[in-house]
UniProtKB/Swiss-Prot annotation:
Domain of life: Eukaryota
GO MF annotations, alphabetized: metal ion binding; ubiquinol-cytochrome-c reductase activity
GO BP terms: mitochondrial electron transport, ubiquinol to cytochrome c
Swiss-Prot/TrEMBL keywords: Electron transport, Heme, Iron, Membrane, Metal-binding, Mitochondrion, Mitochondrion inner membrane, Respiratory chain, Transmembrane, Transmembrane helix, Transport, Ubiquinone
Binding site for heme b b566: H97, H196
Protein name per Swiss-Prot or TrEMBL: Cytochrome b
Organism: Parascalops breweri (Hairy-tailed mole)
UniProt: heme b b562 binding residues: H83, H182
Predominant cellular place of this UniProt entry's protein: mitochondrion
Spans traversing the lipid bilayer: 33-53, 77-98, 113-133, 178-198, 226-246, 288-308, 320-340, 347-367
Function in brief: Component of the ubiquinol-cytochrome c reductase complex (complex III or cytochrome b-c1 complex) that is part of the mitochondrial respiratory chain. The b-c1 complex mediates electron transfer from ubiquinol to cytochrome c. Contributes to the generation of a proton gradient across the mitochondrial membrane that is then used for ATP synthesis.
Length: 379
């Protein structure tokens, strides 16, 4: 009798994706982050669902409802902090996942990569709208500043902003629609992640060497299920330590002050995972230019496959490209630090130089380095 997992229409899909999937024998722990992102998404949807049962999306009661969740709901504080810090874990995994793709040339799978870039945009939009919901000072002013950027779009800008706000300022209508979008978007993310996997399984996974691994495949289960479980345990440990010992470490104290349209916080800044893009936005004195740079800071990832000039796929055997890659990582850390600093000397010039270097590395220096390496290897 044939095994049910190979014949049943639904079980067959699961089997071909997670059990009998042929995987390269040499993929390292950098390939764990896909499954970790899946776990993060499930955690966020579940904790978010329980939070939504107690949250009210009204400007008068939103802040109080979050306080009520933390004080009066059984383990409400735990659910709330798991959700808030789960977002940070989500982004850590996302950045490492994208970094892995850049380093090992996974972007050569064009469909998978482009869906991934779309996923990154969607997750960022979801996180931004989620940050507005507690209706603290940073929620309100963050929403005001970021939505206001759309007014830089010529001709339709002002109308567009007022349309998004549902009025002439960030108010009840804005909060209600942000809650609605924040609820629906994770399910769109889950659907896109399914498409992401669908395209990945058309080609099979890449591997650290960047060479074809068709001649040496092993079944996903038990080898990579066990390996992924280790990653999941480390993720759960890290998240638990964060939630139980310093839940507010990555948050902003200003968000414990209820939203007040009459009082602007001294330093408006987003959550830590947006600071690099925020620094790029602020480094350009022109409003429209800043908005374009902000969008391009993520959209530039979609150009990476077209900028691949090397004869080799992976950076594993390309020392010059490796140096530039780690310079890019250091640059992103610098941008993240600058994004959290006030707009004054010397932070302004550091931010501008780091922003220029960011785009230079991706668009100019890395493709040139690849060509140099080709010539050094007489290719």
């Amino acid at each position: 009798m044939t095994n049910i997992r190979k014949t049943h229409p639904l079980m067959k899909i699961v089997n071909n994706s997670f059990i009998d999937l042929p995987a390269p024998s040499n993929i390292s722990s950098w390939w764990n982050f896909g499954s970790l992102l899946g776990i993060c998404l499930i955690l966020q949807i579940l904790t978010g669902l329980f939070l939504a049962m107690h949250y009210t999306s009204d400007t008068m009661t939103a802040f109080s409802s979050v306080t009520h969740i933390c004080r009066d709901v059984n383990y409400g504080w735990l659910i709330r902090y798991l959700h808030a810090n789960g977002a940070s874990m989500f982004f850590i995994c996302l950045f490492l996942h994208v970094g892995r793709g850049l380093y090992y040339g996974s972007y050569m799978f064009m469909e998978t990569w482009n869906i991934g870039v779309l996923l990154l945009f969607t997750v960022m939009a979801t996180a931004f709208m989620g940050y507005v919901l507690p209706w603290g000072q940073m929620s309100f002013w963050g929403a005001t500043v970021i939505t206001n950027l759309l007014s830089a779009i010529p001709y339709i800008g002002t109308d567009l902003v007022e349309w998004i706000w549902g009025g002439f300022s960030v108010d009840k209508a804005t909060l209600t629609r942000f809650f609605a979008f924040h609820f629906i978007l994770p399910f769109i993310v889950a659907a896109l992640a399914g498409v992401h996997l669908l395209f990945l399984h058309e080609t099979g996974s890449n591997n650290p060497s960047g060479l074809s691994s068709d001649s040496d495949k092993i079944p996903f289960h038990p080898y990579y299920t066990i390996k992924d479980i280790l990653g999941v345990l480390i993720l759960i440990l890290a998240l638990s330590l964060l939630v139980l010992f310093s839940p507010d470490l990555l948050g902003d104290p200003d968000n414990y002050i209820p939203a007040n349209p009459l009082n602007t916080p001294p330093h408006i800044k987003p959550e830590w995972y947006f600071l690099f893009a925020y620094a790029i936005l602020r480094s350009i004195p022109n409003k429209l230019g800043g908005v374009l740079a902000l969008v391009l800071s993520i959209l530039v990832l979609a150009l990476v496959p077209f900028l691949h000039t090397s004869k080799q796929r992976s950076m594993m055997f390309r020392p010059i490209s490796q140096c530039l890659f780690w310079l890019l990582v250091a640059d992103l850390f610098t941008l993240t630090w600058i994004g959290g600093q006030p707009v004054e000397h010397p932070f302004i010039i550091i931010g501008q130089l780091a922003s220029i270097l960011y785009f230079m590395l991706i668009l100019v220096l890395m493709p040139i380095a690849s060509l140099v390496e080709n010539n050094l290897l007489k290719w």
